[in-house]
């Protein structure tokens, strides 16, 4: 699933704003942004970071430079375990015209040596918004990995996996987002929610950042 294929399918599905969140890297965000410009889809640069507890934390950023800088920091915290293409496939960096321009050597599906709290702090240090991913999913969700949804530190925004029960306490007092968590083109879902205001990626990031600080914008998005 290349950036251009991903954004093209999002266009077909009628999605206006999407986020690209590869595991533990943001190296493909530049081409995703280029594809978004071409297809008329707003793209939020990001990544899905694996903590040492095997919890997935989404990091959303306002710009490609922020995402790339955060991605380099995350990559440095991965163990020195090389990818085995025969088992896991090539970890390709996509360049211009959707063509391969390189590969990433470390195995990206590994956990970093950062705790959940440290991952969130790193994302915020680079200007991003951390969001615990699919908290209600058995694998790599916060509830499944930790046995509960912690109240501290504060997680103002959480992502819930659709179609799977989620304990009410886990989302109480929190802002909830949903995603298709697509790893294949056919997994990309059609939109569930729509807004009359036609928000841009910048608008969505402004709202997420406000929610992360538990500030409700007076004029909404």
Where are these regions (language model features)?
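Charged catalytic cores and adjacent phosphate/nucleic-acid-binding surfaces used
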Residues: 1-15, 26-68, 107-108, 121, ...
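Alpha-helix-centered segments that form part of catalytic cores
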Residues: 90-126
């Amino acid at each position: 699933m290349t950036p251009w294929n991903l954004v093209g399918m999002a266009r077909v599905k009628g999605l206006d704003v999407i986020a690209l969140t590869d595991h533990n890297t943001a190296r493909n965000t530049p081409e995703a942004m280029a594809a978004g410009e071409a297809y008329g889809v707003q793209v939020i640069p990001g990544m899905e970071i694996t903590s040492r507890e095997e919890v997935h934390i989404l990091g959303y950023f306002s710009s490609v430079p922020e995402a790339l800088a955060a991605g380099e920091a995350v990559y440095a915290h991965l163990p020195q375990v090389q990818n085995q293409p025969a088992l896991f496939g090539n970890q390709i960096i996509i360049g211009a015209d959707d063509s391969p321009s390189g590969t990433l050597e470390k195995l990206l599906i590994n956990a970093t040596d950062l705790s959940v709290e440290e991952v969130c702090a790193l994302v915020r240090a680079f200007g991003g918004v951390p969001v615990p991913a699919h908290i209600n999913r058995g694998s790599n969700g916060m509830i499944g990995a930790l046995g509960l949804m912690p109240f501290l530190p504060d997680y103002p925004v959480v992502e819930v996996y659709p179609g799977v029960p989620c304990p009410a306490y886990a989302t109480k007092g929190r802002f909830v987002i949903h995603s298709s968590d697509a790893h294949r083109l056919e997994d990309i879902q059609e939109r569930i929610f729509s807004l009359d205001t036609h928000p841009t990626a910048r608008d969505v990031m402004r709202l997420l950042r406000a929610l992360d600080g538990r500030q409700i914008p007076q004029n909404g998005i």
